[in-house]
Every structure is written in C-alpha cells, then in structure tokens.
C-alpha cells in the first residue's frame, strides 16, 4: 500500500512538472516563426459561380520551442469567395471567420484546407481574384499565405431541350453545360465555329433530331469536360477520359454533319443507333475524337462517312462498325489508350447486323497491339470490305483474302518498342500528351492515292500533289 501511494505521488509530480514544461515550451520570441509549404496557393481557373476542389498547404514549427497562433483569419473575411479550414476548424460565420489560440508544438505541423467559389464577372477573359490567410503569432509576428484563383465568366446551360431549330454561336464566351442537351425529333441544333462547350460529368448531347457542327479551320468547335484543374501537378483533367457523356444519335436522327470539331475526354465519343441504311446518318469531317473511356465512334447498322478524322485512344474500339455502310477516307485511327491494357482495337468490324459494307481509303490504322483490325471470325458472306492505299497494323492476310487489300502497307508487328514513334510527332504515355501529325520521314508520306484522297487535310491545309496517308498532311 505504501508503495502504491508513493507511485501516485511520483505520477502527480511528473504531471505537474510536465505541465510546467509545456508552458515553458511556447515562445514569445519574434525570432520564432512558422515555415509554410508555399507562400502562394494557386487554385487554377474556375467557371463563374462554380466551386473548386479542395486544395491544401501545410505549416511547420521547426523551432526549439512551441509557437502559439493567437489568430488565423482571411484578410478580406468571406468577401472574396475563399473558404478556409484550419486543422479541422472552418473559418465561418459562427466564429467570425477566424480561429484563435491554436498551439503548434515543436516539430509539429498543421494542415490548412482551401476551397473557392468564383465570382461572376462581366468580362471575357479569366480574371484573377485573391485573398490572404493571415497567421498572427502570440509574439505579435504576422505571417501570410496568398490565395489566388481565376474566374472565367461562362454561359450556363442546364438541361437544354431543343424542340425548335436553334443556333449556338459563342466564339468569345465559354458555355458550361449541366445535365446535357437533348435535340428533339424534327429540330436542328447548329453549333457555330469557335464555340467551346464544357460538359459536366452527367452531361452530353442526345440527338433525336439533327445536329450540325459548323466549325472552320481557324475556328474549330471544342466539346470537352468541365474540369479545368489538374489531377496531378503535371496532368490536367482534360487529358483524362470519362469526364462527360459524349454524343448519342438515336434511330430517328439523320443528316448530321460535324465539321472541324474536337471531341475529347468523354465516355463514348459518338454512338449512332440502328437506322435506315439507305439514308446518311452522319458525316464527320476534319474532326478529332480522342481519349474516350468507351468507344471513339460506334456505328450500328447505319450509313456514315468519316473524312480527315482522327480517332484515337479509347478503352473500347476507336471505330466499331457493326452492320453499317461506312466510308473511311484519309483518317488516322491510333489506339494508344494508356489507362487499361485490355483496350480494344483501332478498328473493329462486326457482322452482327447484315449486310456490312466498309471502304477504307488513304488511312492509318495503328496502335500498341500487333493486331489493330478485328474482322468477323464467323461466316462473313454478307460482309464487303476494301482497304486501299492505307497503313494497317496487322498480320498480312492469306492469299485468298488479299483481294480486299490494294496498295496497302502492312506495318511490322515486330515493332513493339518504338510503336508510333516512327509515324507521329508525339506519343508520350507518361504525361498523356499526343500529337498525331506526321513526323519527318514518316513512311506514309506520299503514299496516298491522289485521285481519291481529299484535297485538304484535317487542319484544312491543302494537300500536296502526291498526298500523304492519314488525316494530317506533312508540310
């Protein structure tokens, strides 16, 4: 029992001494300051009246003693649109947008979380808005971290129902679309050159009527996801697939024309449902469909033309032809999808719907895998296909099948190291950056058929008298 009471006394004495020592650990010296992971936190660009993702920075006490924060506050209160949380405590109306008396022990650190909602500004270009987080130490020393973001005034669309002929013409101001666009049967939506539409994750374009995209060589139309920030420091969300829903043409939709348009970062780029194969469902010219988490273009029992189109990097097939009448001329199909090794082919042909007719002229079909063209393995008596003046990454067919191939270059399937590097300017799977223009001395230069090849290329540049295979003419 005596030993028990002695133990209690020793523990009590230790706690008293520890309490005294803790009090002594906090310094009032102006020389003892905090170290911050950054002096300026940039939140990138936000559309007006939209909120950012959560950012963070850290503060560290590397002094020999503790430092106490007398207060932490925003220099402008809550007037600039920033929201701050200090070590789990939000700066809110409940605490007057400041927190007080926060100890930072020797060797300890605190995390500060920051979000922002961009203000509405009546200007064309993105405008900076800023604030500062002010840290006042118990010694009276004041330290600050600057917060910066940019607000981009956008026209907001929330579930646009196109029941009558409608024109979207917005070359100067971006359009932010939530919950998608639906074009009803009998109506036409025309999107003029220079327009950019940013789609939220739940949004896309459903076409029961008709869609006309009228881009120009110097004023392309851009359809992409709405995330303007980065998933990593070197990787913008714009390079990540599956950011929005893409374009869906239903059975009642015909005579769709899409020219000089870039469609990227979506789930399915374009899906065309089954319809009358004697009527043109879609004509795609001078277009790019890139980085899709589903199909690039899926054509189901319909009639379509793809001219000077780049279809690249898709989880499923870049182009899937499922019982259709399809013309492919001067296109580049490049399957370098980086996110999944079970990616589909650059070109997949199915005889599920019959008959199927496919004509491929002056085109590149290539990618990671040895076999980038998938033909039906079963009876294909109703399948008619022809490849002419094209580069195909596939094993050379048997003699009896060579009738379907005229003046074709079969890309060596032994090339498993420099895939794409012999053809294209850039195939960078580290930072997901690609440029499918032809590089100098690419072996497809001058190999297209001048009689059937379009006179201009994907970029609207006139082709040479001896043109190149693929969507892009080398200059």
Language model regions located:
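Bacterial N-terminal signal peptides that target proteins for export
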Residues: 1-9
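C-terminal motif of bacterial Sec signal peptides marking the signal peptidase cleavage site
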Residues: 16-19
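Beta-strand/loop edge motif enriched in small/polar residues
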Residues: 21-27, 34-45, 50-52, 56-58, ...
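Short acidic/proline- and small/hydrophobic-mixed sequence motifs that coincide with surface turns
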Residues: 52-54, 64-69
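Asparagine-centered strand-capping/turn motif at beta-strand->loop junctions
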Residues: 59-63
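Short, solvent-exposed loop/linker segments at beta-strand-coil boundaries, enriched for Pro/Gly
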Residues: 74-97
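Extracellular interaction modules
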Residues: 140, 463-467
């Amino acid at each position: 029992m005596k030993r028990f009471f002695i133990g209690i006394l020793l523990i009590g004495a230790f706690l008293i001494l520890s309490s005294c020592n803790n009090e002594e650990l906090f310094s009032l010296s102006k020389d003892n300051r905090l170290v911050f992971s950054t002096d300026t936190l940039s939140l990138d660009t936000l559309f007006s009246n939209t909120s950012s993702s959560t950012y963070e920075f850290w503060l560290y006490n590397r002094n020999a003693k503790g430092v106490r924060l007398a207060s932490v506050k925003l220099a402008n209160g809550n007037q600039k649109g920033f929201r701050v949380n200090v070590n789990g405590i939000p700066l809110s109306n409940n605490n007057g947008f400041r927190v007080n008396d926060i100890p930072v022990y020797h060797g300890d650190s605190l995390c500060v979380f920051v979000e922002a909602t961009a203000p509405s500004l009546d200007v064309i270009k993105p405008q900076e808005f800023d604030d500062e987080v002010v840290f006042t130490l118990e010694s009276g020393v004041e330290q600050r971290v600057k917060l910066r973001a940019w607000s981009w005034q956008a026209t907001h669309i929330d579930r646009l129902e196109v029941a009558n002929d409608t024109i979207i013409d917005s070359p100067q101001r971006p359009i932010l679309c939530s919950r998608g666009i639906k074009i009803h049967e009998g109506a036409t939506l025309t999107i003029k050159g220079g327009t950019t539409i940013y789609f939220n994750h739940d949004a896309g374009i459903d076409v029961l009527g008709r869609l006309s995209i009228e881009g120009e060589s110097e004023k392309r139309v851009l359809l992409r996801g709405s995330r303007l920030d980065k998933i990593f420091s070197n990787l913008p969300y714009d390079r990540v697939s599956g950011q929005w829903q893409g374009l869906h043409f239903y059975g009642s939709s015909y005579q769709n024309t899409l020219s000089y348009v870039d469609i990227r970062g979506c789930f399915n780029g374009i899906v065309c449902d089954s319809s009358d194969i004697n009527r043109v469902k879609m004509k795609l010219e001078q277009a790019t469909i890139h980085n899709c988490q589903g199909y690039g273009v899926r054509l189901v029992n319909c009639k379509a033309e793809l001219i000077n189109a780049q279809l690249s990097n898709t989880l499923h097939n870049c182009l899937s032809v499922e019982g259709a009448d399809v013309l492919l001329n001067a296109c580049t199909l490049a399957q370098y999808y980086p996110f999944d090794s079970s990616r589909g082919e650059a070109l997949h042909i199915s005889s599920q719907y019959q008959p199927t007719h496919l004509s491929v002229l002056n085109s590149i079909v290539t990618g990671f895998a040895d076999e980038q063209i998938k033909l039906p393995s079963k009876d294909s008596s109703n399948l008619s296909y022809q490849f002419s003046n094209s580069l195909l990454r596939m094993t050379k067919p048997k003699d009896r099948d060579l009738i379907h191939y005229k003046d074709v270059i079969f890309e060596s399937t032994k090339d498993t190291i420099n895939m794409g590097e012999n053809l294209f300017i850039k195939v960078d799977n580290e930072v997901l950056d690609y440029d499918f223009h032809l590089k100098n001395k690419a072996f497809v230069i001058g190999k297209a058929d001048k009689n059937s090849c379009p006179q201009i290329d994907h970029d609207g540049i006139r082709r040479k008298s001896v043109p190149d295979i693929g969507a892009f003419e080398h200059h």
